[in-house]
Curated annotation (Swiss-Prot):
Protein name per its UniProtKB record: Required for respiratory growth protein 1, mitochondrial
Keywords recorded for this protein, A-Z: Glycoprotein, Mitochondrion
Compartmental location: Mitochondrion
Cited function: Essential for respiratory growth and required for mitochondrial protein synthesis. Required for vacuolar acidification.
């Protein structure tokens, strides 16, 4: 029985030795990085492709070409190397072209499904599975029965559930707009939440603002953490210099010294409170930067608190969206009553256009 050449130790040793030699000679004898990459890529592909080759003649031919490639590299015959690689390139191009043609041919056979058809199929599948679990339908149902008999029943059941939810929402009364917030760092970004502006209807500017504040808050936190690390090193330097001058080791409560109070005057915040000159020289510059960062953060908090007051003012966004929500509710209630009186009593399952899904779509539900 033919044995794989990869399992013969002498063959494996020879191929690996030659491969290492060629890899070492490529950068030595070829000065084009692009051509070096091309040779290595082609060589790697061919070795992987013929790894399990059992044909002695094929292996013999490939080893001769491998050895010839190494000799051409040593002699600087780059054109001959290109000639050796040409048949491999042609084969690759033909294979790629065949793949593209096959994919284009298969594209013509694929039927693109309408999203509405996909939705109807899911409704039908869920309906059949539910009824089969209850033992109300057999395991096998012909396609004709599924589409002509069960599909209208499934869509009607789905529409009935939808109608019930609409009725419950209208029964609960008009929805009201309210204030909500998202927290980014110290900031509470307030915005109006209502049925009018939920989901995709939400303001794009609000999304941009929230992302910007999130990024700025994180940057501020990172800067403060960096300053705290530098302040610790600065305090060590101050203690060392003070010791060199006075032979005394000073003690400073660094967290308390760097503590920022938001409700005292700025002049008090930034004045150095240490009695040691070296601490003032080393730690105070970092401390002042930290105070500026804290001050900037609290300014943003004040800005968003004032923004909340604007939203709550008479005639502001909250009142506007609350009014629009009530108008939308009144309009939907009128349409629902009209639909209940004029159309719902005459719904027919198996007549397209007069079934319940079509009626709900007609009235915007």
């Amino acid at each position: 029985m033919a044995q794989n050449f990869g399992k013969i130790p002498s063959h494996k040793s020879y191929v690996l030795s030659l491969y290492r030699t060629v890899l070492r000679n490529i950068p030595k004898c070829c000065h084009s990085y692009a051509f070096q990459y091309e040779i290595k890529k082609t060589l790697s592909k061919q070795l992987f492709k013929h790894k399990h080759d059992k044909s002695s003649w094929s292996v013999y031919t490939l080893l001769n070409e491998f050895s010839l490639l190494n000799n051409c590299l040593l002699e600087g015959k780059l054109q001959e190397i290109k000639n050796l690689m040409k048949p491999l390139k042609k084969m690759k191009k033909q294979l790629e072209t065949t793949k593209i043609l096959n994919s284009l041919t298969s594209l013509g056979d694929v039927k693109t499904n309408d999203p509405e058809e996909v939705r109807r199929f899911h409704v039908l599948s869920a309906y059949i599975k539910r009824k089969q679990d209850l033992g109300l339908l057999p395991a096998y149902i012909p396609k004709t029965y599924q589409h002509k008999l069960l599909l209208p029943l499934a869509l009607n059941e789905h529409a009935c559930l939808k109608l019930f939810h609409i009725q419950q929402k209208l029964k609960n009364g008009p929805p009201s707009a309210g204030l909500s917030y998202t927290k980014e760092g110290r900031n509470q970004i307030w915005f109006v939440r209502s049925p009018i502006n939920k989901g995709r209807q939400q303001s794009k500017k609000l999304g941009i603002l929230i992302r910007k504040e999130r990024k700025d808050s994180q940057k501020n936190i990172d800067n403060l953490n960096f300053c705290e690390i530098n302040a610790a090193w600065a305090l060590h330097e101050a203690i060392w210099e003070e010791y060199l001058e006075s032979k005394k080791i000073i003690k400073v409560n660094l967290p308390k010294y760097l503590e920022y109070a938001a409700n005292i005057p700025k002049s008090t915040k930034c004045n150095p409170s240490s009695q040691y000159q070296k601490v003032k020289e080393w730690v105070d510059p970092v401390r002042e930067i930290m105070f500026e960062l804290h001050s900037k953060s609290f300014q943003r908090v004040e800005y968003f608190n004032k923004y909340k007051e604007k939203l709550l003012k008479n005639g502001g966004q909250l009142a506007y969206f609350d009014k629009k929500s009530k108008e939308m509710y009144a309009k939907r209630l009128t349409l629902f009553r009209k639909m209940s009186k004029e159309t719902l009593p005459y719904v027919t399952l198996f007549i397209e256009g007069r079934d319940l899904p079509s009626v709900l779509a007609k009235y915007g539900f």
